[in-house]
Amino acid sequence: MIKKLPTSPKIGMVSLGCPKALVDSERILTKLRSEGYNLSSQYDEADVVLVNTCGFIDSAKEESLDAIGEAMAENGRVIVTGCLGNEANRIRERFPDILAITGAQQYEEVVSAVHDAAPIEASPYVDLVPEQGLKLTPRHYSYLKISEGCNHRCSFCIIPSLRGDLVSRRADAILREAEKLVAAGTKELLVIGQDSSAYGVDLRHQEYRWKDRMVKADLTDLARGLGELGAWVRLHYVYPYPHVDNLIPLMAEGLILPYLDIPFQHASPSVLKRMKRPANEVKILDRLTKWREIVPDIALRSSFVVGFPGETEQDFQYLLDWLDEAQLDRVGAFRFEAVEGAAANAFDGAVPEEVKNERYQRLMEKAAQISEAKLQAKIGRDIATIIDRTDGEGGASGRSYADAPEIDGEVHLRDADNLKIGDIVTVRVEDADEHDLFGVALS
């Protein structure tokens, strides 16, 4: 009589928050799959549902609690992890029947909780997992986390209390992971960390052997190594330290994309001081000018906080004037929101909500004007574009070097019947609006 093999439990996953949390989810699922667990995208088919939460601001916490509530209603067997897991009592008050709660980066605790909730009889099946691990992004791009935590103590932020101080990964381990991703079809590597430009500080910029040379735990050396793998390399969360200047020649060489995501947060010296952000806004403008002298087409993205406690109309106007000079390609903005545990909560000079909203609108209007002018200047030019979507009716959408997934603009193509997701093609730009480009593929 043939013995029937046991059926492996199925795990569902809801991943919320930033790309760094997405990488955490990928790591957890890779581990569980390697042990033989199956994965399910349906609540009613899963034996256990994992909810990886965000706990940075109140709106994100509410979104996480809503997701937990949905998982409880649709399935009932739920394990919570991620940043909101640090507030276990709050979660238990609303959902007393949660199976287990763990905090951010507590990978072993999550896996152990799954073992308790849905024991698996099979032996580990490492061959069930592709060499590059499991991914939650499309095949053609991947987030590559190079560090965890942050050494800064910005007054509006609680990341260090959620994720700890800076912990950098070994340079050789990062390059090995990136090489596997590229071999598996990744065309674009999105480098992330809480503070990517601080990479390697905790390792004292130690050198590691990578193939036939030594690679330093330093963002510039690491970026060079990544650029040699043949994929697009896009740098995110780059704090504007002086050594960031060393990345610009790599862009000029074509090793990494001419794109930097730099969270300036504000420009007014008084606001930056209260935020505990040491950047000098005048020197930053000088550096942007020098970067553009080396790489004229460099795309610069940043995010800003409006309505920070004590922000005056003069401070805000300073920011708008600074944006006129900086001419950033992509801008995101957030209305200040008190975060439990942040020092800024105790600051005087709270800005009324209606003023925050009005300033937010003015900032985004300014950013849109700048963006539209810069995109209009690209009409008639040919740009490389990576394809993200096809519509089956001859249309396609993708992104240029100046566009990160989900947060920046897109390039919309006509007559794109022969294009596939992940293709990198040359597009002639025919039109533009405030955020997107429109054109036709030449190759």
From Swiss-Prot:
Note the InterPro entries from the entry: Elp3/MiaA/NifB-like_rSAM, Methylthiotransferase, Methylthiotransferase_CS, Methylthiotransferase_N, Methylthiotransferase_N_sf, NA-bd_OB-fold, Ribosomal_uS12_MeSTrfase_RimO, rSAM
Q: Name one GO biological process term.
A: tRNA modification
- Entry note: cofactor: Binds 2 [4Fe-4S] clusters. One cluster is coordinated with 3 cysteines and an exchangeable S-adenosyl-L-methionine.
Q: Name one GO molecular function term.
A: protein methylthiotransferase activity
**Residues in domain MTTase N-terminal?**
9-119
**Known EC number:** 2.8.4.4
The cofactors it requires, by name, are: [4Fe-4S] cluster
Q: Which residues bind [4Fe-4S] cluster 1?
A: 18, 54, 83
Q: What is its main location?
A: cytoplasm
Q: Which reaction equation describes what this protein catalyses?
A: L-aspartate(89)-[ribosomal protein uS12]-hydrogen + (sulfur carrier)-SH + AH2 + 2 S-adenosyl-L-methionine = 3-methylsulfanyl-L-aspartate(89)-[ribosomal protein uS12]-hydrogen + (sulfur carrier)-H + 5'-deoxyadenosine + L-methionine + A + S-adenosyl-L-homocysteine + 2 H(+)
Q: What sequence ranges are listed for the domain TRAM?
A: 376-443
Q: Report keywords, A-Z.
A: 4Fe-4S, Cytoplasm, Iron, Iron-sulfur, Metal-binding, S-adenosyl-L-methionine, Transferase
Query: Where is each Radical SAM core domain found?
Result: 136-373
> Where in the cell does this protein reside?
Cytoplasm
**GO CC field:** cytosol
Question: Pfam families, per this entry?
Answer: Radical_SAM, TRAM_2, UPF0004
Residue runs in coiled coils: none
Which residues take part in binding [4Fe-4S] cluster 2? Answer: 150, 154, 157
The task this protein performs is described as: Catalyzes the methylthiolation of an aspartic acid residue of ribosomal protein uS12.
Name the family. Answer: Belongs to the methylthiotransferase family. RimO subfamily.
* The protein's name: Ribosomal protein uS12 methylthiotransferase RimO
Q: Supply the source organism for this entry.
A: Zymomonas mobilis subsp. mobilis (strain ATCC 31821 / ZM4 / CP4)
Q: Which gene encodes it?
A: rimO
